[in-house]
Amino acid sequence: MTEINSGAPVSHMAHHIPKFAKYTKDIGLADPKKEIQYSIVLKIRNQEWIEKQVYVQNPTCENFGKLLGRGEINSLTKPSQAHFDKVSNFLQSKGIQSTRDGDNLKVLSSIEKTQDLFKTQIHKFTQPSGSQDDTIYKRVGGFQVPPEISDCVDLVVGF
């Protein structure tokens, strides 16, 4: 599995406090039956091509000023249908439904299934002076993208 740790060195993760935690109170483990929504961002295609596009801004380069339109860029970079299908089918095999949302998959799942899928713990946070509607569900620590889909997934956001 691919370990995700917010970019901080693993040795420092135990001391890393997310910004939202400074303004919220950790109530503890979230109710495993509660449903949460999050997004899975799929890897874009043609990353090497994207990195070379900086040269369209350099007057000394032969591609200077050769800008592409949004549609052309999207057709060259959007995640492949095979990646959408692979991740969507994998989630479905785990009893998790997803819908396509642009270049991402929007997921609605129980906390229990989400924790099992990503090998993480999700806690419930509230704002100490807020109302019940101010509840936030966030993972505590790192998580792992399952190896079956790690070649397709760039980022998971929302928990």
Curated annotation (Swiss-Prot):
SMART domains cross-referenced by the UniProt entry: Pro-kuma_activ (SM00944)
SUPFAM superfamilies found in the cross-reference section: Protease propeptides/inhibitors (SSF54897)
CDD domains the record matches: Pro-peptidase_S53
Alphabetical list of InterPro entries matching this protein: S53_propep, Tripeptidyl-peptidase_I
GO molecular function: serine-type peptidase activity
Endpoints of the signal sequence: none
Induction: Down-regulated in grlA-null cells at 16 hours of starvation.
Name of one Pfam family that matches: Pro-kuma_activ
Record protein name field: Uncharacterized protein DDB_G0291952
Organism expressing this protein natively: Dictyostelium discoideum (Social amoeba)
